[in-house]
């Protein structure tokens, strides 16, 4: 059977502990790509982080991020598919999370919007791509409705 595409999840599949990719995985991905098979990184993470790891393994195709809510060509503005959550629904989700004491991350292409300063620090460590400025991730901490409205307005098209 000849495959045209291989989709690889990141967390718990491609990435080992400490966010590393084994040499064996890199070698296998290169061999598959050299046979003309598209290698696509797929993840629940935001686009910039997925694209960063896609580069690390040498995948030159599209990236599927945010649990399928974003499909985008790397290093371009070409978005193949994007499904945003309505602004009012985001507000309701944030309000419910705050009332229940739940840490929340809302994603744009390159930004995490969170309701927790602790989560902010953890996310900076987990999603660090500081060695590649093309894939930097911003983190906005939102602690009240006014700030949430400001942030949602900034990212309304993202």
Where are the language model's segments positioned?
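Structured loop/turn residues at beta-strand edges in well-structured enzyme cores
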Residues: 1, 57-59, 157
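Asp-based phosphoryl-transfer active-site loop
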Residues: 2-18, 93
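Short amphipathic alpha-helical segments
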Residues: 10, 77, 157-158
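An N-terminal domain-start capping segment
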Residues: 13-21, 127-130
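Short secondary-structure boundary/capping elements
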Residues: 20-24, 143
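Active-site phosphate-binding/coordination module
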Residues: 23-129
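Acidic, His- and aromatic-enriched active-site or binding-groove loops in soluble protein domains
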Residues: 121-148
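Short, intrinsically disordered, charge-balanced linker/junction segments flanking boundaries
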Residues: 145-158
């Amino acid at each position: 059977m000849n495959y045209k595409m291989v989709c690889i999840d990141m967390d718990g599949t491609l990435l080992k502990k400490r966010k590393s990719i084994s040499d064996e995985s890199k070698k296998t991905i290169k061999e598959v790509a050299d046979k003309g098979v598209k290698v696509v990184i797929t993840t629940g993470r935001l686009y910039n982080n997925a694209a960063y790891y896609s580069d690390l393994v040498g995948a030159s195709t599209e990236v599927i991020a945010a649990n399928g809510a974003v499909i985008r060509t790397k290093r371009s503005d070409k978005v193949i598919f994007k499904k945003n959550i309505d602004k009012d629904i985001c507000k309701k989700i944030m309000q419910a999370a705050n009332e229940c004491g739940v840490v929340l991350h809302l994603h744009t292409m390159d930004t995490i919007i969170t309701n927790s300063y602790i989560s902010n620090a953890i996310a900076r460590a987990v999603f660090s791509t500081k060695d590649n400025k093309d894939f930097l991730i911003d983190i906005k901490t939102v602690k009240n409705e006014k700030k949430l409205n400001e942030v949602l307005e900034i990212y309304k098209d993202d």
